[in-house]
Amino acid sequence: MDPGVEKKKQQMELVDVESGGLPVERQDSLFREAVRAEHAGAAHWDEQDSWGRTMSLAFQCVGILYGDIGTSSLYVYSSTFEHGIGHPDDVVGVLSLIVYSFMLFTVIKIVFVALHANDHGDGGTFALYSLISRHAKVSLIPNHQAEDELISGYSSSGKPSATLRRAHWLKQLLEASKAAKISLFLLTILAIAMVISDAVLTPPISVLSAVGGLREKVPHLTTDQIVWITVAILVVLFAIQRYGTDKVGYSFAPIILLWLLLIGATGLYNLIKHDISVLRAFNPKYIIDYFRRNKKEGWVSLGSILLCFTGSEALFANLGYFSIRSIQLSFSFALLPSVLLTYIGQAAFLSKNPKNVANTFFAATPISLFWPTFIMAIAASIIGSQAMISCAFATVSHLQSLSCFPRVKILHTSKRFPGQLYIPGVNFLLCVAACVVTVSFKTTVIIGKAHEICVILVMIITTLLMTIVMLLVWKINILWVALFFITFTSTEAVYLSSVLYKFTHGPYVPVAMSVVLMVVMIVWHYVHVKRYKYELEHTVSTDKVKEMLESHDLKRVRGVALFYTELVQGIPPIFPHLIEKIPTIHSVLVFISIKHLPVPHVDTSERFLFRQVELKDYKVFRCVARYGYRDSLEEAKDFVVTLLENLQDYIRDVNLYTDEPHTISAHSSCNHSFSREKPSGRYAVHAEDMLTPIESFSEITALSNYGSDRLPHFKASKMNMEELAKIEQEQMFIEKEMEKGVVYILGETEVVVRPHSSLLKKIVVNYVYSFLRKNFVQGQKMLFIPHRQLLKVGISYEI
């Protein structure tokens, strides 16, 4: 059948219903896609559950996720025994601590608990915050819309139960308390700042540990020479980031797998050759003996021992497209035995050679395997560092979607893998910081002390957010939640106290970096929220818009104008400012808001929301383009084509229904609660009136709350060809105006504080924020807007 005929047939079928008492829905442009996307998501996970795909993913994730954890064995013992081994049994005590710390934090907490808190395949602190944000309105930006909850995979409810009531109570508590919202936000950005600081410290400590192995063969090498070799490798590592890893990424898994086999075999060799009795470390009594014997020094050493599970946070954050089963399989059968064997083997070696603790890993390597091990160590350390650098890029991208970071240029290095990012400015700063850290600290022991606080703080914050997820999202038994919370907060608090005791010996560096990052995030987010609230309070009224559109001085020009605004509700105050300066309006005007939702991805079929602004003859529309925090913005040309196609669909849908007074209005006196029902029995009506700050973009009211006499009426049981032709004519008008040209109108808002504001507020807004805004990427570059089609409109807000 001809596609055009089929399309018209579907339109006729859509309205071929009787209006008398049948619950009908006034669909928004996206509402009809929700169930389709939901089924698509189910099919996706079914595909992931196949064993063939699981085994393939298990192999691939070895190279992407395990590089950092797999190279920690290069420096753990040397960092722990900084002043030498005091007692022969200390080696067994430390090994016991390493084994149980690794099992508790990496295996149990991350691999078998935290991975289940992934956000549709995305992990890390940001994913946990997004999960919480979807189930409770904790965002500080007042731009939530009822339609957001219609996005497939947004959130779900459950059957009435004690756990559900507890979750509802927690939801109300988080939404009602501004202090709770701010605390949750600060915890999240602190963890994110620590992850970025970790990306500065991981490359130096990993590469420096690997390069340090040269001293086993070239003992006359000085510390400075080792440092400068490391710096050279780091510069090359950061320089190649612009090319992406998709061309060489396929080799990561074989390299890391070979590395794990190598260190596992070497560990087994050392265990058999030197001292098999170190296996008694699996008895936890040696941990107690270690603390009794060393007292304060044993407690202080915990900070270095926690380096054995560094990389666990990156494993969770870089979860990406890997399934939970694939990670658990590869972790259990590849990483876990290899890592345990290498720590056990090094302990066996140290029990017979306690003076070789400064470079335990390479000293314990058989002579015949030294050079292969050295080369593999360099390669593995680079791959492990690459994972943290990529994690930093993704984190900055997520921060921008949260409106917590200035605009930076983000490049996608792979068409095949959309998640591979490169941020030139961030890459340069990471490179400089990593080189400065290497040259300043010179040894892995000091860098390790700095690294410790990043690892433990991210772990603690993950525990806190996981506890909220268990109560609010998972809704599991309170006893399991209490067990998880008490076990991990108590043990992590002990590790944190050990790290803080050595604060002046290294941890102050990542703390200082994190403070700077947090100041930038807080200032940017604070001003963004204030500016948004200002625009919301000064939204242009319906009467004012009608007055401007009906003005005789207002001229119409051919073409389409896209007016970008961050406001998702109503018309921004910059619009009358533009009309006052340039009394001209295009034939089609679309107010566009780019909005990021707390979901990883928004399907293109669910991207756009439309609403027409009165007067309808003027063809003025409001549009919200919704993206997930991992979605990238399209090129302007592609974006416009997709937008106008969806606009034409909206015009078709909205004209299928009458605008008789019976249509339920947003201003109706019956203002019932919003409802979100699937299209299987109950439907909803969307208001057509232009929005005010207190209204949703398209308010949804359950029709069951109304009498049958108040249901929307169709023009006829079947639309005639004349009406269909009218719809097609309006669609053609949009298409012709697009051919005349598209103009992008971008507001340049200068934010200043009121004259009588406090000195601190003046410094934050007038100086710090102003500096950030002027020295980072401008809006048109972020949106890929061609310069010759750009019109900037300046305005100043006093907040």
Swiss-Prot record:
Q: Which GO terms describe its biological process?
A: potassium ion transport
Compartmental location: Membrane
- State the annotated membrane topology for this chain: Multi-pass membrane protein
Q: Name one GO cellular component term.
A: membrane
What biological function has been recorded for the protein in this entry? High-affinity potassium transporter.
What keywords are annotated for this sequence in UniProt? Ion transport, Membrane, Potassium, Potassium transport, Transmembrane, Transmembrane helix, Transport
Provide the membrane-side ranges marked Cytoplasmic in the record: 1-56, 115-181, 241-251, 323-328, 384-420, 474-475, 530-799
Tell me what organism the protein belongs to: Oryza sativa subsp. japonica (Rice)
Show the disulfide pairing.
none
Gene name per UniProt: HAK21
Q: Which residues cross the membrane?
A: 57-77, 94-114, 182-202, 220-240, 252-272, 302-322, 329-349, 363-383, 421-441, 453-473, 476-496, 509-529
State which ranges are Extracellular (membrane side). 78-93, 203-219, 273-301, 350-362, 442-452, 497-508
MF terms from GO for this chain are: potassium ion transmembrane transporter activity
List the signal peptide residues. Answer: none
Descriptive protein name = Potassium transporter 21
Family note: Belongs to the HAK/KUP transporter (TC 2.A.72.3) family.
Major localization class: membrane
